[in-house]
Amino acid sequence: MEHVMIRRLEHLTGSAAAPTLGFGVETRDRPGPLHKQGAFQDDVAWIQLHGGLFVARAAVRICWVGEYSDVASVRARTRGAPIHDLDEFWRGRPRYGYAGVATLARETWLDSPFWAGPRTYGYEWVVLESDAKRRSWLEPKDPPRGGTVLLDEFRVWRGGQA
């Protein structure tokens, strides 16, 4: 199975050589795609920046899904990864609800980032459970109006990482 993990540029972590996302996280006030369908060992997770630019891919090592009564309990599952310490990433999330936390491995930047996918409507995780959905999300397309700014910002961000 393949998945798309959507993250804002300011929540990206890693070096110029490789991403170090560590975890894919979905928290919602109602069950979302990751909570409903899960992710399993060796599933592919594509990393898309909010705005439509695909920049990396990883493999799922293990995934936890469940209900939570305090978002701090979800955050605790990411301890040791850079995302754990990004307060901005955790701010504004539902205080209680449904979550999925996928541990990522074999993270790599794409040699050529590409634009793809429909609007995300606030989702952080999408499961590509059919060929049609996979095509809809992964077939390259032209950047959106003003989208080249995101590509430039990503290149600057990645170039500035040690």
Locate each region found by the language model:
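Sparse, context-dependent recognition of short Cys/His-centered cofactor- or disulfide-binding micro-motifs
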Residues: 30, 45, 87-89
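Short, conserved beta-strand segments within well-ordered enzyme catalytic domains
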Residues: 46-48, 59
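Aromatic- and Lys/Arg-enriched surface recognition patch
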Residues: 54-55, 59-138
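Compositionally biased, charged N-terminal/linker segments
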Residues: 1-41, 48-51, 108-162
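Short beta-strand or tight-loop elements
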Residues: 41-43, 100
